[in-house]
Design a protein with these regions (language model features):
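An alpha-helical interface "stripe"
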Residues: 1-170
Length: 170
């Protein structure tokens, strides 16, 4: 047991009774992100947590590389938020990941995760860390003689173009 929760993509899709996102174009599971930020940053006020969730959920870089770099920095170092202390605005960092105790994080694996971008695609598996997609796994049928690693690699490269928003935090 590695501590990952498993869900089928349909179960968390828009319109499902257990939906975790409002639209197929959304790739960040905001409820999980918010819960993790609250758990990991109990010293920050509600408004700071709300600001951190908004910054991540609404971030739009000028390129996939820029977006990925900024999200990586936020995951590694924390999301900058402004809080008021003694009448003064101060910048703090809302930590996204518990780096010393992995079990304190929310790990989720979703199979058949539908995402709508330039096209609609459905990666075989997506791994989420505290609501952020951090890994995309493409599986191939070992009984299919034409299936190989290069086909899986090319499929993931196509995903970068077609559903690039899935790669911003990963």
């Amino acid at each position: 047991e590695l501590g990952y929760e498993y869900r089928h993509g349909e179960k968390i899709s828009p319109g499902s009774s257990t939906s975790e996102r409002a639209k197929y174009a959304e790739t960040i599971l905001k409820g999980r992100l918010e819960a993790a930020l609250r758990r990991l940053n109990s010293d920050l006020p509600e408004l700071a947590i709300d600001e951190a969730v908004r910054r991540v959920a609404n971030y739009a870089g000028t390129s996939l590389i820029e977006s990925n770099r900024e999200m990586y920095n936020w995951i590694r170092d924390g999301i900058p938020v402004d809080i008021e202390i003694d009448g003064q605005m101060q910048r703090r960092k809302a930590q996204v990941v518990h780096w010393t105790d992995a079990i304190q994080n929310d790990w989720l694996v979703v199979n058949q995760y539908t995402v709508k971008g330039k096209k609609t695609d459905r990666p075989d598996m997506v791994v989420f860390l505290n609501g952020l997609p951090i890994a995309i796994i493409e599986l191939k049928n070992p009984a299919d003689e034409t299936a190989d690693v290069s086909k899986a690699f090319n499929q993931i490269k196509n995903y970068q173009t077609e559903i690039g928003q899935l790669f911003e935090p990963s």
